[in-house]
Amino acid sequence: MHREHLASRLGFILLSAGCAIGIGNVWKFPWMTGQYGGGAFVVIYLIFLLILGVPVLTMEFAMGRAAQKSPLKMYQALKPGSRWGWHGYICLLGNVVLMMFYTTVAGWMLQYFVDTAAGRFAGLDVSAVEVAFGSMLANPGRQTVYMGLIVVSGFLIISAGVQKGLERVTKWMMLALIVLMLVLAVHSLFLPGGSEGLKFYLLPDIRRMEDVGIGNVIAGAMNQSFFTLSLGIGAMAIFGSYIGKERSLAGESVRVCALDTLVALCSGLIIFPACFSYGVDVKSGPALIFMTLPNVFNNLPMGRFWGSLFFLFMTFAAYSTVLAVFENIISCVGELTLWSRKKTCLICGIAIFLLSVPCILGYNLWSSFRPIAGRDVLDSEDFLVSNLLLPGGSLLFVIFCTTRYGWGWEKFLAEANEGKGLKIARWLRPYMTFVLPVIVGIILVLGLYNFFAS
C-alpha cells in the first residue's frame, strides 16, 4: 500500500492523543487521584509522565518516523537482517488482542449512550441500575450488535484513507470530546456541594497518602503514567511514520501527554463534584461508569440530557482509541500481504469481529471459561496486553533505541531531535540507557506479581 502522510501537525497530535485517551482516563485516573492523596498524587504522576512516559513515547515516534513503516516492518528498516523483527509481529498481536476486548467495552459505551438518551434509566433506583448493567452483560445478542457497529463503522472510516478517513474523523471527534468534557466539568462544578468533591479530588492530602502507603502511591503514579499512553505495541509508532521531519519529537510527545492529562484531570472534575453532591461513593472501573454515574444522573435536574452527553463523551474516548489501533492493524497486515487498503480493512474487520465475540460470551454463555489465573475472558485478554505486552514491548523499544545491540543512541537522538522544537539533551544518555529500562522492568515485574498474587 502507498504510505500516506497526515495533512497537518494538529491531526498528528490529536490522533496520537486520541490513541492515548481512553476509558482508563475516566474510570481509573480520577479514582486513583482521590484515593492516593489528591493533588500530591497528581504531582508525582506528572513527574513520572515526564521521566518515563515522554521518553518512551518519543522513542516510538522516532522509530516510526525513521522507518516510514508499520511496527511490523520498522525493525527490518532500522536494523536489517537482525532478529529484532520478531517483535514487530508481537506488536501486531498486541494490537489485535487489545481490540478483542476494547471493541466490546466501546460497544458498552455506545449502548449506554443510546439507553440514556432514550430514557431507559429514568426513575430506576440504585439496585435497578445495577440490575440493568448485569442484564446488559447477560445479553450476548445486543452486545454483539453494538460491538459490530463499532467494528464495521471503524473499518469503514479507516478504509477511506489516512487523511480522508482517519485524520478527518478523529480531528472532529477529538475536538467534540474536548468541548463535551469542558461543558460537563463546568456543569458539575456548579452543583450544590460540588466544591467538597473538588477539594477531596485536588487538594493535597498527605494523610491519605500515608494510609495507602507512600510506596503504593509512587507505584500507582508510575504505573498510571506508563499505561495511559498505550506504549509498547507500536500504537504510537504508526503515527510517527505518517509525519515529516519539520518538528522534533520530544516536544510533540509533551503535547500529546499534556492533552491526555488534561482529559484525565477534567474527568475527575466531572465525577467528584457530581458524586459528592449526591453523597455517592466514587468507585473505579466499570462500577463507576455503569452503576454509580447513572444513579447520579437520575438525581440531577435534566439528568437524561447530562447523562447522554457524558456517555457520548465516553463513546468518543473509546472510539478514538479503536480507530487508532485499527489503523495500526491494517497498516501491519497491508505491508505483510500487499493487499489493497479496502481489501485489508474488509478481512481485518471480519477477523476482529469474530475474535471479539469470546469477550462478550465470557459474561454469559462462557461464564465458566476462565483462561488465565481464574479470570474471565476480558480480564485475561487485558492481562496479556496491560501486564505483559505493553511493558515488555516498551522495554524492548528502550533497549533498541539506546544500545549498540539495536538501532543505537546516536541514530535515535539524531531522529528525535531533527526539526524545530524541544530537543533531547545528550547528557540524558546514561539515564535513558541504564535507569529508564530498570523503571520499565520494575513495572513489568510488579504487574505480573500483582496479577497472580491477587
Enumerate the predicted regions with their spans:
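Membrane-water interface regions at transmembrane-helix termini and the short interhelical loops
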Residues: 32-36, 83-99, 134-136, 149-173, ...
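Transmembrane helix-boundary motif of multi-pass solute transporters/channels
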Residues: 11-48, 234-240, 251-254, 258-259, ...
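Select transmembrane alpha-helical segments in multipass membrane proteins
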Residues: 5-16, 41-44, 83-96, 145-150, ...
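Membrane-interface "cap" regions at the ends of multi-pass membrane proteins
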Residues: 1-27, 56-61, 65-78, 82-89, ...
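Membrane-embedded translocation segments of transport machinery
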Residues: 2-6, 167, 171-319, 323, ...
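Inter-helical loop and helix-membrane interface segments of multi-pass membrane transporters/permeases
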Residues: 3-4, 32-36, 66, 71-90, ...
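C-terminal membrane-solvent junction of multi-pass transporters and transport-like membrane proteins
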Residues: 87-90, 338-349, 380-440
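Juxtamembrane transmembrane-helix boundary signature
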Residues: 9, 14-17, 44-80, 103, ...
